[in-house]
């Protein structure tokens, strides 16, 4: 039986036995690599119902196939069909047709014969239109035509009344036919990725619609008509441009999922609380500043995402969201969580990354189901003890680079409240700046790439900076949310963060600092405060550029200054620069005795001093007379003295009050950004993608605890302030918040005026330490402290909309104009605690970078108050530094008039009446204002008058008076009162008038930083420095020994940093076409205050710190368009240091540099030049150089590649391909700003010296002298240079913008290589100057030539701040002196290196680490200073670490404890250095300038 069955089983299938044909209805030939339809198919044409030919290579369908009359489903997707044969009409029973992923261009008209068709899938075909016959397929229920080329639908499309699903994603539809209202059964409609600019009117008539996708269109409004869709369950409107949601959306009663991500929403309607069935609400990536309380009515809400907004608080009603399971509030500005959050007991995942949380409520312990909690990138000091109740917690993220999801927590008592708290080694958190360097240009940005590469390659040896130091320095803790006045009380603890922990991640530190700085981004007054923070108590007005607005800012001294702020909706480069300059020409307090009258009055700021804020851009500034002659030897601070105090102050800076540092301001700032970054300080971030991030870092750096500087070391305080700017060694630079500190000086009265934005520089005079931020991209922070701050990830933090806001960057540049707060803050700094600095200018600036990028990416980018003001241009507020007691007598008012749009004029010159004594005012002339004018330089190097610059700055003859400012530095002593108010502004106004794109690190800044970076030398109570004085020709007249007298630390110290940063900013602006939309006026770019020599050193440090900012600048460069800029987080990026800040710093720095630079080593500047590659000097180096050559620093720092410089097209992004280096015009623009005309010779305080060359002051003149094709030449030169970076060339590259730009040797501190060449307009200003500038630049060029050596020298000099190195630097300066004759263009072409390598033996005692980072080596990232050299190079030196006085960035390590490092692999070198015991003997090669 069994056998029989088996036999039958086998036979039955056989047809012979069955006696009938088998019925085959389904054939599947999918994925058979068929090139044609198999013939076997035709054997079953009677029975075949389904045929699958998916994923073959069939090119055509045979006619025989259409004889299969019974075919109901034909599936031939993913083949090579080019058409559907008309014979398809014979398939009358066909119900489903799938021809997706072919090359079918159209449906045949007779498709209408397939009456039974219900489903057509024809996606991913080049179908451009549907035939009329298509609408006769009346049984069609599902139609999929995604990713086709449809531009319209047939007018009678509504005949398909049975249609239930219609997917038309990724077409080119702009409208829908009105007949579609007949589609009564339509439930799902997908119109995503089309070109709708408004919601089609017919939609609200499709009453049964349940799912609607309208994402990725161009909708600007979500109309109330959507509320008619009562059945709507799912609505996706993400990735549009929606600015408002109508209240009537509440009509969608059935709505469960509402997606509004990535729009431009600034608020949600209260009626959203009526969507009772809502389970998912996504409003991430918008511009929300608050959430409606009615959100608590969404009782069924399970997922809520409001990340990447500008929220400063969550509504307490969030506690009613009892069904909530996922809560994401990343990348906002939350300082705290509502206690009611504990009522959300069902939350399993909560992410609070990148906020400003300083503590968490105990009630979080009630969220028993919490499994994942992300708290990374906040400012938490500990966790509440109630965390022990979270039994289900599986992941607690406290850091982005945390190795394990859960890490053990220890219990300890809170130091203040004595409550039990949980902590571990990751606390307290440091604000971190994102290292986001986005490019807003389509072209490759070699400079940015190089910087990023260097960062990736950098190995940082632990600089054992205690966390506390980092905290103090990096964080401006209480400042964040405080009102400016509150801040004044609390004092900004802008302690420079030490490089210790952060040395490895200077950017991170900077970012942290910035984040820590709670300064409201939008508080322009804060920025003012920073400026006021400068020693001067004088009330400084934000740049008048915002003349349209009139604001009265109370000065620290209590005087009110009425500033008319012009709003320039879309400032053009020159205009912006001039605006910035105007800002810089703020009215100083009469108490300072400095009165700046700008020949071009923009507005009259009614100040007690009645300083005029003349804002006419074109008008040449009136000759400035220093009534007080600034020369008060007694008050003057010797460089040495300044330096020591500098070192001290960074550690214990006086409390800084950030004026107007109200978080609210941040919103304003976004507004400002929207208004085109009124405060140019933002420009860095905004200007370029790079810029934003760097700006951020700069921002954090700027928050130096100037306020906390010890009163005992008043001089030291100022010095430290300067140092913060200038000296990497001081944590201050990291704090870089000095700007804030400066703000602090600003009286609370100033704070309220948000509209007044102080230029970035104003906001960041102190912050210019942050210069390192700019530089940091390319280099390991040379000066750990300043650099770290500068290195803040802020730089990298992405400026979301940066690309869109190209204009903003420009504005930022402008914003730079400002008074360095440091000046005000100097010695009196601690005293002015009561003064409230304006809200963090950086916060505003932070926003600036780009509405999109910055917002999320630059938490630490504080858009400084300058930006915070709603004013569209940063220059509208010159910083009105509150008159904070400082080395400058509070009475000294800084008027910075930056009227000329070109900035070329000495318009910036205001008459500054300095008190004879410590209150001497430093004239910070916006570098951009005297783009090419040497006056500033003269001021800086009180001794010599730069004929070049001065020629150009022929603005009603600037009289440069050497004005010794005790408050400044000894070099500052001869702050000649240049006729250029901006120069005078320099320190006080932060010299921020020079608004350099922040993204571009300024070599100057770097140098500045370097100078101050040497913490120990600065710390010295007093020092003797040899200051080389230069005559007008910039020929060294001799070395003057300057003793650091005990002076109030010149505000310039911080300012220096600011100056430094401004320089960088400018560079960045130049670098990134967008950011550099228009080059800020040269003067602005180069505006520096003129600190004493010591201050100069500080300035150097500051610049050095700015070095890292180069990345920022670049970033802004690459990306922001002015619109985006505006969109950028208005105030959301408080952390981000606005480029203006950086600029301001540079400007400040200029003054400082001029004065301190005597002692500063020119090489450092040079080194700074080499910073980008070889060009980028180490931060410290740069600082030192900056000290010596303030002007240069600013410009040099700017990497051309970061932004292609489009001097002509303000808004247009230049093709970066030419090179990241700025066009000559860009460089030229920078040049004047960079120049701090303060004599280098500390002693030379002759007014006559300062007076030198008043005639050439007009920058426009210098522009005129530039060859017509100078930009092209510059770009070519830059590009060539970029492409072939030999070691010498690399330094040249660094010089790129800096190398030949500096007008004279003294300018070397601001090497203005090609990349620093300002635009033609600037050249005009610098007119004949340009060539003199060129001479100057040639100094820069020389610095570039000397870069390798100079960097070393500068480092040494800065480290020691002792005469030996300074002497060398002066000699190099002397060398430069002769070079002044060089043309900018000429210098551009030149690659010659004046430097020579020299070997040194250095012994470092580990404590606990070596305190420096290395790069290069075989298989290493390469040497940032000399990419062609495969040796091991020092890229960052912890400012206060064991190597701070011994090594400089750029040093090549030849041996270590007998081990040769010549041909060593990178990893081996790192391991070897780490393996050494306590003492390490190094043989290093440093390039010294001849």
UniProtKB/Swiss-Prot annotation:
Keywords: Cytoplasm, Glycoprotein, Leucine-rich repeat, Methylation, Phosphoprotein, Repeat, Synapse. LRR repeats lie at residues 23-44, 47-68, 70-91, 93-114, 116-137, 139-161, 162-183, 185-206, 208-229, 231-253, 254-275, 277-298, 300-321, 323-344, 346-367, 369-391, 392-413. Residues 687-700, 859-871 have a biased composition (Low complexity). InterPro entries: Leu-rich_rpt, Leu-rich_rpt_typical-subtyp, LRR_dom_sf, LRR_R13L4/SHOC2-like, PDZ, PDZ_sf, Synaptic_Scaffolding_LAP-MAGUK. It is found in: Cytoplasm; Postsynaptic density. The keyword Metal-binding does not apply. Brain-specific. Highly concentrated at synapses. Residues 663-676, 872-882, 1243-1263 have a biased composition (Basic and acidic residues). The modification Phosphothreonine is found at residues 831, 865. Residues 663-709, 775-808, 822-899, 1194-1218, 1238-1265, 1282-1312 are annotated as: Disordered. One of its GO terms (biological process) is response to toluene. CDD domains: PDZ_densin_erbin-like (cd06749). The keyword Phosphoprotein applies. It comes from the Eukaryota. Signal peptide: none annotated. Residues 1398-1488 form the PDZ domain. The modification Omega-N-methylarginine is found at residue 1149. Residues 677-686, 787-799, 1194-1217, 1286-1307 have a biased composition (Polar residues). O-glycosylated and phosphorylated. Required for normal synaptic spine architecture and function. Necessary for DISC1 and GRM5 localization to postsynaptic density complexes and for both N-methyl D-aspartate receptor-dependent and metabotropic glutamate receptor-dependent long term depression. Belongs to the LAP (LRR and PDZ) protein family. Interacts with CNKSR2 and DLG4. Interacts with CTNND2/Catenin delta-2. Forms a complex with N-cadherin through CTNND2. Interacts with CAMK2A. This is Leucine-rich repeat-containing protein 7. The lineage of its organism: Eukaryota, Metazoa, Chordata, Craniata, Vertebrata.
